[in-house]
């Protein structure tokens, strides 16, 4: 399936283009649109309605990045890290620069005493679960979705980039949209891939896509 990166400045119609591409690529499988902020999610919903006679298409799902990680990647395969289906939600209580000393594979690295996923380790856990389950996380996504669209990729950081790399290596269609001049937020404060931001981050995605083609 196609892998695409669109670098678009504010006001260039990137939301229209993303939604139009999604509608044109509908198949018997679902399509997933992911964005970082709730504001971005609402913008996608409104644009999709405009292009589909005022209603959201039943085969198009829209989620924020953390909802995607929690519901589509972590919860279905939490048995690979905990004994019971005990994971609740994602905790954003970690302070900037907080060091996590638990080793990879130790459930306490990813999960708080309240059974919430540590936000800084959410994408790392998704990556770990896919690896530990021999690719079941990605295989499930391939079964459910034909295309995954990720808006606001300039806000991704840390292990997010490794997980996107895994998506780009899959049989899914992947469509990334970003604007390095609008990098306002960061999904986490992990030091992983800390040298990749702004223009360097988008160049990183360009290189990844070139490798997969």
Can you describe what each PLM-predicted range is?
Residues 25-26, 139-141, 167-170:
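Conserved catalytic network of the ASCE P-loop NTPase/AAA+ motor domain
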Residues 33, 147-151, 213:
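Short catalytic-loop micro-motif centered on adjacent basic/acidic residues
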Residues 2-6, 79-149, 158-159, 163, ...:
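Accessory N-terminal region flanking or inserted into the helicase ATPase core
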Residues 1-75:
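P-loop NTPase Walker
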Residues 74, 78, 154:
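Conserved ATP-binding/catalytic motifs of P-loop helicase motor domains
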Residues 165-213:
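Conserved RecA-like helicase ATPase core segment
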Residues 30, 146-147, 171-175:
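Loop/turn-to-beta-strand initiation segments
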Residues 17-21, 47, 137, 159-167:
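A short acidic, amphipathic alpha-helical/loop segment
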């Amino acid at each position: 399936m196609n892998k695409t990166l669109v670098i678009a400045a504010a006001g260039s119609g990137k939301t229209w283009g993303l939604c139009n591409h999604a509608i044109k690529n509908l198949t018997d499988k679902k399509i997933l649109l992911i964005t970082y902020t709730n504001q971005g999610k609402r913008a996608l919903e409104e644009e999709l309605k405009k292009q589909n006679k005022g209603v959201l298409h039943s085969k198009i799902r829209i989620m924020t990045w953390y909802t995607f990680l929690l519901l589509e990647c972590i919860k279905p395969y939490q048995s690979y890290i905990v004994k019971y289906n005990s994971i609740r939600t994602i905790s954003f209580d970690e302070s900037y620069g907080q060091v996590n000393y638990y080793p990879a594979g130790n459930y306490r690295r990813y999960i708080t005493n309240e059974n919430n996923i540590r936000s800084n380790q959410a994408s790392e856990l998704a990556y770990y679960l896919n690896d530990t389950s021999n690719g079941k996380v990605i295989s499930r996504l391939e079964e459910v979705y034909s295309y995954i669209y990720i808006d606001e990729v300039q806000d991704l950081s840390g292990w997010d980039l490794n997980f996107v790399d895994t998506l780009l290596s899959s049989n899914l269609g992947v469509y990334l949209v970003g604007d390095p001049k609008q990098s306002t937020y960061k999904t986490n404060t992990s030091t992983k891939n800390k040298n990749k931001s702004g223009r360097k981050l988008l160049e990183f995605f360009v290189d990844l896509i070139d490798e997969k083609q």
